[in-house]
Amino acid sequence: MNPQGHIVFIVDDDARIRESLCDLLASLGSSAVAFGSVGEYLSYARPDLPACLILDIELPDINGLDFQKQISDQDHPPIVFITGHGDIPSSVRAIKHGAIDFLTKPFSEADLLAAIRAAVALDGKARQERAELATVRQRFSSLTPRERDVFPLVVSGLLNKQAAAELGISEVTLQIHRRNVMQKMEAASLADLVRIAEKLQIPITRSRRTGAP
């Protein structure tokens, strides 16, 4: 099963379901770890790999939908729900809160595997984005206070003389700071620096835009 280098977590209180899913995934070359409760899953040291969480609705310690809500702002893998008692309100709630799919038992292998592939791909992309954000944040932390003042002015589109006037420094000094910002942020162009600023959510006020009153 592609992509490689991923792991599937299974949380279901039915031992037979856990065993059958682990066997299926193992036969396809996927790593899988199964748990009988959410508590067991949370106590597991998850490896740093793209992942998918196959989650039952009715669990001994918490309802799967409630658990989904609890972890909505945390870095847990995308969820594929499986349940023997599915209903439309539950499926709508699950999908609305980001579940990849909501499968009612018995479900087809094809549907499950398609959902797992989608979840792993989504998690891989999210991990890459988090890594890129961590990198640009580290670069931003290397800027001096003055360079941090210059950064939003540069990406706002102000001319050097306009930015220099706003900061009360010479145009030559502004150009030096601008060059340092470009180098430290490893921006190949102004457009590249703008994209970095967007990732960092660098604020740009109306007064900083070219032609603003």
Q: Whereabouts are the PLM-identified features?
A:
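Short amphipathic alpha-helix used as the core "switch/output" element in two-component signaling
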Residues: S43, L65-P77, R93, H97
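Active-site residues of response regulator receiver
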Residues: D56, T83
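Acidic catalytic/metal-coordinating carboxylates
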Residues: G36-S37, N63-D66
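Recognition helix of helix-turn-helix DNA-binding domains
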Residues: L159-D192
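Acidic, metal-coordinating helix/loop segments flanking the phosphotransfer/catalytic sites
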Residues: A34-C52
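Basic, Lys/Arg-enriched C-terminal extension of HTH/homeodomain DNA-binding domains
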Residues: M182-P213
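C-terminal output helix
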Residues: D87-P89, L103, F107-R117, Q162, ...
